[in-house]
């Protein structure tokens, strides 16, 4: 067995195409998952049970099932419903890439929402009391105090989740 440089040169365009698809999945799923996670975070910290409970159920289901099962359900299960095949989303869900983006976004949203919630809960109460002493409203405290500190606290775990998403995006290929 010898090292065949010609085989590597011939395979390079296919490998580069795979890298492009992987990064496309990573960016699109990461952004959609982050937007979903922010919505879930706001539902979780709202203090309203009718927002908190559905978010908890969603997070419990998507964190409790393997991503491969979720991809199979999206790719093989959703087309079983006539309403899905007749919807405006069918051209996207008909393709494997669209199904992978949907499944990865839903899964990432569940994990990232818990990462962000941990960051929000990690903000020291004394800092929020200082904001109240300065006359800040609850909205101002959340925007100017909680969000920057929570972002800093959640960033290491979020970067780990982005790396996990990169690895999971290879399932599609």
Predicted regions mapped to residue ranges:
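Transmembrane alpha-helices and adjacent helix-loop boundaries
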Residues: 1-172
């Amino acid at each position: 067995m010898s090292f065949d440089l010609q085989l590597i040169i011939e395979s390079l365009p296919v490998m580069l195409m795979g890298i492009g698809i992987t990064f496309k999945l990573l960016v699109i799923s990461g952004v959609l998952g982050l937007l979903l996670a922010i919505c879930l975070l706001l539902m979780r910290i709202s203090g309203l049970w009718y927002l908190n409970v559905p978010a908890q159920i969603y997070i419990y289901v998507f964190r409790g099932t393997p991503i491969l099962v979720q991809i199979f359900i999206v790719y093989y299960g959703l087309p079983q419903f006539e309403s899905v095949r007749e919807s405006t989303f069918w051209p996207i869900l008909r393709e494997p890439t669209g199904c992978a983006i949907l499944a990865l976004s839903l899964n990432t949203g569940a994990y990232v929402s818990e990462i962000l919630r941990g960051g929000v809960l990690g903000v020291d109460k004394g800092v929020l009391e200082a904001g109240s002493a300065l006359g800040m409203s609850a909205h101002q405290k959340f925007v100017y105090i909680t969000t920057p500190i929570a972002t800093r606290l959640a960033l290491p775990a979020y970067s780990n989740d982005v790396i996990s998403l990169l690895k999971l995006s290879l399932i599609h290929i």
